[in-house]
A protein has these predicted regions:
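C-terminal edge-of-domain segments
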Residues: 67-74
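A short acidic, Gly/Pro-enriched loop at the edge of an enzyme's catalytic core
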Residues: 215-221
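A short, flexible beta-alpha/helix-coil linker loop
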Residues: 23-26, 82, 228-231
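Non-catalytic nucleic-acid substrate-recognition regions in nucleic-acid-modifying enzymes
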Residues: 1-61
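SAM-dependent Rossmann-like transferase core, predominantly class I methyltransferases
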Residues: 74-108
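Conserved S-adenosyl-L-methionine
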Residues: 97-215
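Short, contiguous acidic/charged loop-to-helix segments that flank catalytic cores in large enzymes
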Residues: 211-212, 229-241
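Conserved small/polar residues in nucleotide/adenosyl-binding loops
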Residues: 245-249
Length: 249
């Protein structure tokens, strides 16, 4: 661990918490491993930066380790928040659908550039927004920031270059259209706000409507995550039978 040139990656004031896991390895104590790795990094940084003080008051560089079958991998967390955090959903309704799961559902639904997609339980709009971004080839995470953007050894110009490249590959003139409905006006307002933040507000349309009045448009792909008791974390709701037999498609 000491042999890694940490001083080439971490400045003298870097904060560097150590976290990790162990699987099928002789070293099973995570706290002990954290302590050993931390001490090795500290010793190397002190030597590399020629200092006896490491204030850890600067940018955070999360050090992660993974022990698997007695082989240790050391990593720097370049992402920060989970990749499902796209950067456009500042707020969400109760029991929101993860963006990554919504993107997978859009894939399974075979959403294309000219698709018409509807969601009768749109909530904060995640399913339709992810479907729109897929249809328009908008890179996921384009609106968010990553931990490595603050790392001193990664040129800021690299991030700007890649973002410009991703923007250039977006297809904004597609025929895709999405329509979302929800009985809750607050959810509809939130969906509209999220769509605007995601840059797909011209392709995603949301309005207040009761699912009892829903009838899918001809040729529409219906993607939805209907509310149910267990997901909403209510014992009463989970005990009730749920029926959406009145839906017309």
């Amino acid at each position: 661990m000491y042999s890694i040139p940490w001083e080439e990656f971490l400045p003298a004031d870097a904060a560097f918490p150590v976290t990790g896991s162990s699987l099928n390895s002789q070293l099973t104590s995570i706290p002990a491993c954290q302590s050993v790795i931390k001490k090795a990094v500290v010793k190397r940084l002190m030597k590399g930066h020629r200092t006896t003080v490491l204030p850890e008051s600067g940018v955070e560089y999360k050090v992660r380790f993974m022990l698997r079958k007695n082989v240790c991998e050391i990593m720097l967390d370049t992402t920060g928040e989970g990749l499902h955090k796209r950067g456009y959903r500042r707020n969400a309704m109760e029991a929101p659908l993860r963006e990554t799961l919504a993107a997978t559902i859009a894939d399974l639904g075979r959403v294309r550039r000219d698709s018409l997609v509807e969601d009768p339980f749109c909530g904060s709009g995640t399913l339709l927004i992810e479907a729109a971004q897929k249809a328009m080839n908008i890179a996921p995470g384009l609106k968010r920031r990553f931990a490595a953007e603050r790392y001193s050894f990664v040129p800021a110009s690299l991030w700007a270059e890649q973002r410009q490249k991703a923007l250039a590959e977006s297809k904004l003139d597609v025929g895709f259209e999405a329509f979302g409905y929800d009985i809750d006006p607050a959810a509809v307002a939130l969906a509209n706000a999220n769509a605007k933040l995601a840059g797909v507000e011209k392709r995603c349309h949301f309005e207040v409507a009761d699912v009892a009045d829903f009838a899918a448009k001809q040729e529409a792909i219906v993607l939805t995550n209907p509310p149910y008791g267990e997901r909403m974390s209510t014992i009463e709701g989970a005990a009730k039978p749920v029926s959406y037999t009145h839906l017309r498609a």
